[in-house]
Regions:
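N-terminal, well-ordered alpha-helical segments
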Residues: 34, 38-41, 73, 77, ...
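DPxDG-like acidic metal-binding loop motif
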Residues: 57-92
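Short glycine/serine- and small hydrophobic-enriched flexible loop segments
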Residues: 41-42, 77, 81, 179-183
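N-terminal beta-alpha supersecondary unit
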Residues: 1-63
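Short, charged/polar low-complexity linear motifs in solvent-exposed/disordered segments
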Residues: 42-44, 85, 107
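Glycine-rich, phosphate-binding/catalytic loops in enzymes
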Residues: 22, 74-76, 129
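Residue-level signal for alpha-helix termini/capping positions
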Residues: 45-48, 81, 101-102, 186
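Oxyanion-binding and handling regions
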Residues: 1-20, 31-34, 88-217
């Protein structure tokens, strides 16, 4: 199995290739100067694989940078249209908590991601050596709410230290996405059109009512 992971939900973009157990990852922060396909070519070269050998593509669905997530989904959809490839979306929150587990954090750990407008996406897990269990589902909290919990909480996430200096900076990575996919006993692949960013806010626009003006004769 050759799995390509694409994680663009945070300021640290990454792609990773797991080719028959050989893993390579390319990361880029901030400027995003390297096109996604250039990053993919890099990991293909490092694993001595070809594009044609990629049979599975995993996408980080966020929440996070809506533009980045949309770009990753568009890449996956285009790849599926061009050839026979299986697609799977995984929450970037799950990738972050998996990395927190790898870094041996234990107890209650909250993933905190910037949601703009002085708000944050937040989900809490109980983490032990054996794994992690969600105890507070992903939801949106205000800055004041997050600050009120900061003294006793273990906060992790991309850019978390901008608001909470005691937090642990942890980014979701494409390598972690591939590991999470391989660890699943059942994988429910989806057609490209079913991949959607995780976005908890209601739609910001309202459809205009039909015009009441009489039609022109």
């Amino acid at each position: 199995m050759t799995i390509l992971g694409v994680e663009f939900s945070s300021p640290q973009r990454s792609v990773a290739l797991n080719h028959n157990g050989v893993v390579a990852e390319a990361r880029e922060e901030g400027g995003r100067h390297t096109p996604a396909l250039g990053m993919i070519e890099k990991v293909l070269a490092e694993t001595a694989a070809t594009r044609q050998e990629i049979d599975t593509l995993i996408v980080g669905l966020g929440p996070g940078s809506y533009t980045g997530i949309r770009a990753a989904i568009a890449l996956a959809q285009g790849w599926q249209l061009a050839g026979d490839i299986k697609l799977l979306g995984i929450s970037s929150v799950e990738a972050i908590i998996a990395r927190a587990h790898e870094e041996q954090l234990t107890g209650q750990v909250s993933v905190v991601i910037d949601a703009q407008r002085q708000e944050f996406y937040l989900a809490t897990y109980e983490v032990s050596a054996a794994g992690w269990t969600e105890i507070e589902p992903l939801h949106i909290v205000t800055l004041a709410e997050a600050q009120s919990r900061a003294a006793t909480a273990q906060y992790v996430g991309p850019e978390v230290t901008r608001w909470f200096p005691a937090g642990r900076l942890i980014f979701p990575t494409a390598t972690t996405l591939t590991h999470l996919a391989l660890a699943r006993t059942r994988i429910h692949f989806v057609p490209g059109e079913q991949l959607e960013p995780i976005y908890l806010r209601e739609t910001a626009f309202v459809k205009a009512p039909p015009s009441r003006l009489p039609k022109a004769l």
